[in-house]
Amino acid sequence: MQQSSYTFDELLACGRGEMFGPGNAQLPAPPMLMFDRIVRIESDGGKYGKGYVEAEFDINPDLWFFACHFIGDPVMPGCLGLDAMWQLVGFFLGWSGGPGRGRALGVGEVKFTGQVTPDVKRVTYKIDLKRVIMRKLVMGIADGVVEADGKPIYEAKDLKVGLFTAEQMAS
């Protein structure tokens, strides 16, 4: 049975390439790792019954991006929340047994209706897989929501991530 949640230390191991095997999906290391734990991952859950991932990121005023984005007006860059959603789709593909290294391929639509400021305590990412392709092409297509303290603030439709073997990346 596959593991259904992951601690920060386990995510760091994934970032070192120790989870899915050499040449396969890895998460980025901090500070680009944009979540502290995966609280739920399921192969057949979510809105579309194709898979679900939920992760959390503890926010504190000392996080690196608040010091530079923006001086006197600290806010987490929206692109980091978008990247976190891509990270989670890639993790799902590796967790599902897909071979290769993850690469973001695009997103259909992104809406920002709120922000992450230093007073926010927790960001939650919710990813609903719409399509999972496990052939020569390994790709996940998903919708995602980012919440700040339980309030939806970003929405992404058709997040696309692919896994590519060394041979595919060389050609």
UniProtKB/Swiss-Prot annotation:
The record's listing under InterPro entries reads:
FabA, FabA_FabZ, HotDog_dom_sf
Q: Which GO terms describe its molecular function?
A: (3R)-hydroxyacyl-[acyl-carrier-protein] dehydratase activity; trans-2-decenoyl-acyl-carrier-protein isomerase activity
State its location(s). Cytoplasm
The biological process GO terms on file are: unsaturated fatty acid biosynthetic process
- State the reactions this protein catalyses: a (3R)-hydroxyacyl-[ACP] = a (2E)-enoyl-[ACP] + H2O; (3R)-hydroxydecanoyl-[ACP] = (2E)-decenoyl-[ACP] + H2O; (2E)-decenoyl-[ACP] = (3Z)-decenoyl-[ACP]
Q: How does it assemble?
A: Homodimer.
Give the protein family: Belongs to the thioester dehydratase family. FabA subfamily.
**Known role:** Necessary for the introduction of cis unsaturation into fatty acids. Catalyzes the dehydration of (3R)-3-hydroxydecanoyl-ACP to E-(2)-decenoyl-ACP and then its isomerization to Z-(3)-decenoyl-ACP. Can catalyze the dehydratase reaction for beta-hydroxyacyl-ACPs with saturated chain lengths up to 16:0, being most active on intermediate chain length.
HAMAP family in UniProt: FabA
Q: What is this protein called?
A: 3-hydroxydecanoyl-[acyl-carrier-protein] dehydratase
Q: What is the lineage of its organism?
A: Bacteria, Pseudomonadati, Pseudomonadota, Alphaproteobacteria, Caulobacterales
